[in-house]
Curated annotation (Swiss-Prot):
It holds the Pfam family Thi4. One of its GO terms (biological process) is thiazole biosynthetic process. It comes from Pyrobaculum arsenaticum (strain DSM 13514 / JCM 11321 / PZ6). Gene3D superfamilies: FAD/NAD(P)-binding domain (3.50.50.60). This is Thiamine thiazole synthase. Involved in the biosynthesis of the thiazole moiety of thiamine. Catalyzes the conversion of NAD and glycine to adenosine diphosphate 5-(2-hydroxyethyl)-4-methylthiazole-2-carboxylate (ADT), an adenylated thiazole intermediate, using free sulfide as a source of sulfur. Pathway: Cofactor biosynthesis; thiamine diphosphate biosynthesis. The keyword NAD applies. Keywords: Iron, Metal-binding, NAD, Thiamine biosynthesis, Transferase. One of its GO terms (molecular function) is pentosyltransferase activity. The lineage of its organism: Archaea, Thermoproteota, Thermoprotei, Thermoproteales, Thermoproteaceae. SUPFAM superfamilies: FAD/NAD(P)-binding domain. It comes from the Archaea. It catalyses: hydrogen sulfide + glycine + NAD(+) = ADP-5-ethyl-4-methylthiazole-2-carboxylate + nicotinamide + 3 H2O + H(+).
Amino acid sequence: MELKIGRAIIKKGLEVLYEYSDVDVAIVGAGPSGLTAARYLAEKGFKVLVFERRFSFGGGIGPGGNMLPSIVVQEEALPILRDFKVRYQPAGDGLYTVDPAELIAKLAAGAIDAGAKIILGVHVDDVIFRGDPPRVAGLLWIWTPIQMSGMHVDPLYTMAKAVIDATGHDAEVISVAARKVPELGIQLPGEKSAWSEVSEKLVVEYTGKVAPGLYVTGMAVAAVHGLPRMGPIFGGMMLSGKKIAEIVAKDLAEEAYALRA
């Protein structure tokens, strides 16, 4: 029995890694913006892979309300909540409360049911680039426990037509790209202190392409563009995820058309 269990895990696990070594879109971070983007891109028929460094979904949703079992979204994000069948309760002044556990579960299920693949426990170590001027063309990754151990282990590769940084406050993928491929011309001022009303609008407004092949969504937008943080309100995160899905889908469709022309 043990032999059959082990072989089944090894066979299927390696098949998954092989199949997803080349994708349309690689999203780094399974938080609210990353999962939202994954669902809307997968629904459009793109091959979507999400890498998450933890062994759980949700990013900052779970502890978001200072560990209380409630978080807030604003009215503009309600259509997304309805898409994912997430329940919400009015809290006044255009704000609504949501159960963080329900939001985590349904964002993840929505992305998976739409066809996105999520691989947990992965640390993205670097980017792949091509061309002059350069374009981001994929990711280098290792398992998170290896990265945490400090041992030197060479990473594996995933090629992608588009890479989305949804890693949150530190914009980890874009930070690496800015440091190691300076020809991309990326500046990273870091996020500012809290101003929730302004940040919720600006994070969505500034969501988009950072460099050829490289995109940003969610709190990473604040780090890249020097915007204020917002705290435990999550509507902007989901709106940013939906917007980046629309931008990437449009760019990939235009690139595919150009190749056929």
